[in-house]
């Protein structure tokens, strides 16, 4: 199998290196995408369309598409644009759009039985800095270690922190998203929750799982299993492709 990896906020393709190496050891292939505004494409404009197109250009027929954190949002847009190419889509502690809603709305909404909006972002904001041009940075190593990498050794956490880049949102926080082809395609799909996650609250992971109509898979890691347990993550991703949905997709 061939896996296409989409990183989350502040990260870039580099974060998947160890997981791809582990997959290759299992007899599979993997490629990671730098989204515009990140990694080798840090100077490119970050828009919903640019990010979607960067992923679509990497997908080959039958690929497994993997989105982490906010990258789940981008991966879904790519799957909407190229549903005929995607063999499976896996969400690793990742976001899922809500039809007709913006990204911040999708991230803040609980299931209806739990109430509408929950905009609490916790203490993490205290570790962020904002440039005059609107770029957002994770400015503090201790904060990154706490929220992203707490189960990594310090050397690994520092290696990752030194590679974090700015997050430039462009239109990604303001534009309502519609992905009708994704909902209609009913693609094979899975969700992996990180049991020690300090970035994605359990209620949000549970909400995304229910909206995907899948049984939740788990890995006992921080928000960044690609660094702390890449071999275990690789094995779980391979297993995820053998699972099938247990219910329908819920667009909103």
Which residues are covered by each model-predicted region?
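Conserved alpha/beta-hydrolase catalytic His-Asp/Glu region
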Residues: 131-183
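Active-site loop/oxyanion-hole signature of alpha/beta-hydrolase fold enzymes
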Residues: 35-64, 77-81, 103-114
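Conserved HGGG/HGGXW glycine-rich cap/lid loop of the alpha/beta-hydrolase fold
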Residues: 2-40
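The conserved beta1-alpha1 loop
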Residues: 4-8, 67-68, 193
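Conserved serine/cysteine hydrolase catalytic core
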Residues: 162-212, 216-231, 235
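Gly/Ala-rich beta-loop-alpha elbow adjacent to hydrolase catalytic centers
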Residues: 66-71, 75
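Flexible "cap/lid" loop of the alpha/beta hydrolase fold
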Residues: 80, 84-86, 90-132, 171-175, ...
């Amino acid at each position: 199998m061939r896996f296409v990896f989409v990183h989350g906020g502040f990260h870039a393709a580099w974060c998947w290196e160890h997981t791809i190496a582990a997959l290759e050891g299992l007899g599979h292939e993997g490629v990671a995408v730098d989204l515009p505004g990140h990694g080798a494409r840090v100077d490119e404009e970050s828009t919903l369309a640019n990010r979607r197109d960067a992923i679509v250009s990497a997908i080959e027929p039958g690929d497994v598409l993997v989105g982490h954190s906010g990258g789940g949002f981008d991966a879904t847009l790519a799957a909407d644009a190229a549903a005929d190419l995607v063999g499976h889509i896996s969400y690793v502690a990742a976001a899922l759009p809500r039809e007709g809603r913006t990204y911040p709305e999708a991230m803040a909404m609980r299931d209806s039985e739990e109430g509408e909006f929950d905009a609490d972002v916790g203490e993490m904001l205290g570790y962020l800095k904002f440039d005059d041009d609107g770029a957002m940075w994770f400015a503090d190593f201790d904060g990154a270690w706490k929220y992203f990498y707490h189960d990594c050794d310090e050397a690994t956490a520092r290696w990752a922190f030194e590679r974090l880049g700015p997050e430039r949102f462009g239109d990604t926080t303001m534009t309502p998203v519609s992905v009708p082809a994704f909902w209609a395609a009913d693609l094979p799909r899975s969700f992996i929750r990180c049991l020690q996650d300090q970035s994605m609250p359990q209620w949000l992971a549970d909400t995304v799982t229910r909206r995907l109509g899948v049984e939740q898979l788990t890995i006992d890691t921080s928000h960044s299993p690609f660094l702390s347990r890449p071999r275990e993550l690789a094995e779980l991703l391979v297993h995820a492709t053998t699972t099938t949905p247990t219910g329908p997709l819920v667009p909103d």
